[in-house]
Each structure stands twice: as C-alpha cells, then as structure tokens.
C-alpha cells in the first residue's frame, strides 16, 4: 500500500517582500510555486527576531530557522543568551573563560581572541568580543591579541573597515588588546573541507606567514584597493618593526568567540586536533576555549556555553511513534536538516534515513545557480517511490547560497531551478495522496540590493516567509495568520493525526 507521506520543503533564503526592486523571488519565473499558491491555503510566518529567539530586529538565519522548525517551540539562541549574560554580569564569571585567562596570567603567556568581526549576529557579535576584552582587563592581562575574521556576508560587503575602527576604539577605551591578524571568512571559516583556504588563515595566526601590513586598517584598505571585499581579504599578518605583533604559540590561551558551530569547526581542528589531516602542520598545545560546543568529538577544548538539550523535537517524537522519516539536502544545508533540525543532536533518530547530495565544487555559487537541486530532486523522487517514509524533510539551498553572492541574475536562475524541482516534487506527493508543506527558514533572495546604497546586498533579511499547505485535503480550507517557524511542527503533527507533545509550545496553524 502506498504511504501518504507528509513532507516539509524548506526553500532556504526565500522571503517575502512587497518591494519589487532587487527582488529575485518576485523577478523569477516560477509557474509551479504560483500555481500551488493560487490553489492551496497559504500564510506568512515570522522567521526573525524575538519570534525565533533572537534579539528584536535581528535577521533570521539557517541554523536558527531549522532549530525552531524542528523543535516546535521558540529556541533562545546563543546570541541572545550570551548578550543577556554580558548585560547581567554572569558572563564575567563563566568558568571556561575565566580559567583560560587565569592560566595566561599565571604562566605569563598570551591570550588570543579569534572570531568573526561584525555585528551580523549569525556567527558572532562584536559585543561579545568587547565583553572578552573587558574580562581580560579585569583579570589584569596585558598580552591580548585579536585574530579578526572579516565578514562582508552577514553584513555589507565592505563594512569591515568600520568594524576594525570600532574594535580599535574599544581596545583603546578598555585599555587592552591589539589586532594581530585579519583574514576573510572565505579562508578562516570554510565548512567544505577546502583545506587550502584554511591553511592560509592558520599560517597567518600560528606561523606569522602571509600578507603583511603595519595595521589592520592598512590591510583592509589594501584589500579594497585590490577589489577584494571583506569576505575575501587574504590572511594578513600585522607587523611591528618587521615582526608579527603576535603568533599563537604553545602554552597560550585561545578563545574562539564564534557561537555558531558549522564554520568554526575546521579552523579549530587545524589548531587543536591531534588527528588532524587537512594539511601539514606542527601540533600546537594551547588552552583552547570554544564559545559553544562546535563538535562533540573534540575533547581537547573547553566550552564556555554548553548546548541546552531539547526533548520531543519533531524528529524524535515521530521516531517514538514508530514512524519512518527521511532528511535530504545537498552538502551546504545537510547539517541544517539533520543536526540543527534535531535540536543540535548529531545522532539520527530510530528509522531516520539521511540522503546527502554533494554540493558542486565551484568558487562561488553564482557560477552554478542550480547547484545540486536537480540531483536532490531525482534522489527524492526515487525515495518517494519506495513508499517507505511517513515524514520527509527537504531543503533546497539555492535561494540562500546564491543570494549570498549578491548577483541578482544568478539568484533569479536559482529560484527558477528550484521552482522546476518544486513542481516535480509536488506532483509526486499529490500522486501519493500525501501532504506537502512549503516554507523557508529566513529571507535573503528577495532583497538583492541595499536600498540605501544601491550596492549588492549579500545578507539575510528580517522578512516573513511563506507557508503553503498542498494536499487534496487542503482545498477550500485556510491557515491562520500571525504564525512563526515554531508553529510548523505542531501543524505537521496534526495533519499526521498525532497528538502534539506538551514540550512543543508552537501553535497548529490549521483553521478548524
């Protein structure tokens, strides 16, 4: 007998904006989406700010979006949690942070603070770095060095100089800290095993090798002069009298202040992992603190903010009912439909199958806007024909990953490719008498230009996202307004005929 699968399709970075200018979502020819939108119930969901556990007005992101969707409740993010602790003062007694600083003081070694320098709030926040500098000052440390990763992706592409100036002013005011290196996140924060990039960032921080400059401002200005925006700044060593300001050495303390794990793992492994094989390097012995848990299998690090655990996430609850589920995405978003969707748990649930389709190896995704969407779709159709799954979670990475390039024509092509795939998937699910919910985790591709400057916009947005209910049972029915991402899981469970567990505080969006 054919199963009637309930599927959630997440169009990553597909937001809704009334403004048509620079809007790749509106500009794209998407007959399949339009057809489903016209025929089936739909509403808009909030995917940013307090509705997803972020600070008010903070744009959403993929990690946060998938956590909220999978948990069926608002998940207070590390960003909100750490900022709150700095305000309340408990940050300054955090055991792991205090221990790393005390050891640097006792052993007369250096403290290195590394991470993404911006207020983007996706991977890090400059205020957390300022908090660490204040703590270092309180502890009486003098040898404190910052290894700044330049952003240009979650914030404007050439805003890095402003953040460097802001940091230098803060260090002056607090009375401690010097910038030792700067590197574009393209190098320091790779997540796709492109070790030749990571090696350049590592060499700057540890060996003092790479581009040279007499100040961080000089380094970033040179980069702009060479037409390299923040994300692509070549790893640069800041020198004084012909010598590096500082290098990470044996016995030093290192605090990595990024709170989002996925782009923090590779450079961390390069520094601390005794089994590291990415490139040739000598083993360092440092006191290393990760702001959050980047990887459970890394035992040689301390963690400042351990993950909170969540019971009865959507995947766990469906598994407890003896049902089969599938998670499917290409490499760029695979962690999102598995690890993040499961509330930060790496281990699959019972009867949870996973299909990983490799993302194309291109320098930037505007060069291949369709990415691996067609391959993901082919694999999904094959799996649907097996009649095995009760629930399927699917992610199309294109609107987000191509949206990040700032190239509008490419983002339009990305959405058109996804629409083609969406049509095939919807037809197959309807053929199986199943239900397809279509949504997004946050906005991006609907705003491809910065309206204040007219320049390309590469960051996420705070726009709402669509929520469509595609099913024979849905015709003529309606969905509630005023929803948020946390309402999706209770809605799916209701359609599956399952009771919503008490831990899920989201609301079912079906109008009775």
Swiss-Prot record:
Catalytic activity: (2R)-2-phosphoglycerate = (2R)-3-phosphoglycerate
Keyword Manganese on entry: yes
GO cellular component, one term: cytosol
Its EC number(s): 5.4.2.12
SUPFAM superfamilies in the cross-refs: 2,3-Bisphosphoglycerate-independent phosphoglycerate mutase, substrate-binding domain (SSF64158), Alkaline phosphatase-like (SSF53649)
Cofactor list: Mn(2+)
Active site: 62
Molecular function (Gene Ontology), one example: manganese ion binding
Keywords from the named record: Glycolysis, Isomerase, Manganese, Metal-binding
Entry keyword Cell inner membrane: no
GO biological process, any: glycolytic process
Listed Pfam families: iPGM_N, Metalloenzyme
UniProt binding sites for Mn(2+) 1: 400, 404, 460
Disulfide bridge map: none
Note accompanying the cofactor annotation: Binds 2 manganese ions per subunit.
Pathway membership, UniProt: Carbohydrate degradation; glycolysis; pyruvate from D-glyceraldehyde 3-phosphate: step 3/5
Ligand binding (substrate): 123, 153-154, 185, 191, 260-263, 333
Positions of Mn(2+) 2 binding: 12, 62, 441-442
Family under the similarity heading: Belongs to the BPG-independent phosphoglycerate mutase family.
Subunit text: Monomer.
Functional description taken from the UniProt entry: Catalyzes the interconversion of 2-phosphoglycerate and 3-phosphoglycerate.
NCBIfam families per UniProt: pgm_bpd_ind (TIGR01307)
Stated name of the protein: 2,3-bisphosphoglycerate-independent phosphoglycerate mutase
Lineage: Bacteria, Bacillati, Bacillota, Clostridia, Eubacteriales
């Amino acid at each position: 007998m054919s199963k009637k699968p309930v599927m959630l399709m997440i169009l990553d970075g597909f937001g809704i904006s009334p403004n048509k200018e620079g809007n790749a979502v509106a500009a794209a020819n998407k007959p399949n989406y339009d057809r489903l939108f016209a025929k089936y119930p739909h509403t808009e969901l909030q995917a940013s700010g307090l509705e997803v556990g972020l600070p008010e007005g903070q744009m959403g992101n993929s990690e946060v979006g998938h956590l909220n969707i999978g948990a069926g409740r608002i998940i207070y993010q590390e960003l909100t949690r750490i900022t709150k602790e700095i305000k309340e003062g408990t940050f300054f007694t955090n055991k792991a942070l205090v221990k790393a600083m005390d050891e640097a003081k006792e052993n007369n070694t250096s403290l290195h603070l590394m991470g993404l320098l911006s207020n983007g709030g996706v991977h890090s926040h400059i205020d957390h770095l300022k908090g660490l500098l204040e703590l270092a000052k309180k502890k009486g440390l003098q040898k404190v060095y910052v290894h700044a990763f330049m952003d240009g992706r979650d914030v404007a592409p050439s805003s890095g100089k402003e953040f460097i100036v802001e940091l230098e002013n803060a260090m002056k005011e607090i009375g401690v800290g010097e910038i030792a290196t700067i590197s574009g996140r393209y190098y320091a924060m790779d997540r796709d095993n492109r070790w030749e990039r990571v090696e350049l960032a590592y060499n700057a921080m540890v060996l003092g090798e790479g581009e040279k400059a007499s100040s961080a401002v000089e380094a970033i200005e040179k980069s702009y002069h060479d037409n390299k925006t923040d994300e692509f700044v070549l790893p640069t060593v800041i020198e004084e009298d012909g010598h590096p300001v500082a290098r990470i050495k044996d016995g030093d303390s290192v605090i990595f202040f990024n709170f989002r794990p996925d782009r923090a793992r590779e450079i961390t492994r390069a520094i601390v992992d005794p089994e590291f094989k990415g490139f040739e390097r000598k083993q360092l012995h440092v006191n290393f603190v990760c702001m959050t848990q980047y990887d459970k299998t890394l035992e040689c690090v301390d963690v400042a903010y351990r993950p909170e655990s969540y019971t009865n996430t959507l995947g766990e609850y469906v598994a407890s009912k003896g049902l089969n589920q599938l998670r499917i995405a290409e490499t760029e978003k695979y962690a999102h439909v598995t690890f993040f969707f499961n509330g930060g748990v790496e281990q699959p649930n019972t009867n949870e199958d996973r299909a990983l389709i490799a993302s194309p190896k291109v320098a930037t995704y505007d060069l291949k806007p369709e990415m691996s969407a067609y391959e993901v779709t082919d694999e999904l159709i094959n799996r649907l024909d097996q009649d095995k799954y009760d629930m399927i979670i699917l992610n199309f990475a294109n609107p987000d990953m191509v949206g990040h390039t700032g190239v509008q024509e490419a983002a339009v092509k990305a959405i058109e490719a996804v629409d083609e795939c969406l049509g095939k998937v919807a037809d197959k699910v309807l053929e199986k008498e199943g239900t397809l919910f279509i949504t997004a985790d946050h906005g991006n591709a609907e705003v491809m230009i910065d309206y204040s400057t007219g320049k390309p916009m590469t960051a996420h947005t705070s726009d709402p996202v669509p929520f469509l209910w595609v099913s024979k049972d849905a015709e003529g029915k309606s969905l509630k307004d005023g929803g948020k991402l946390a309402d999706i899981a209770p809605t799916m469970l209701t359609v599956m005929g399952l009771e919503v567990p008490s831990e899920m505080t989201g609301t079912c969006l079906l109008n009775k």
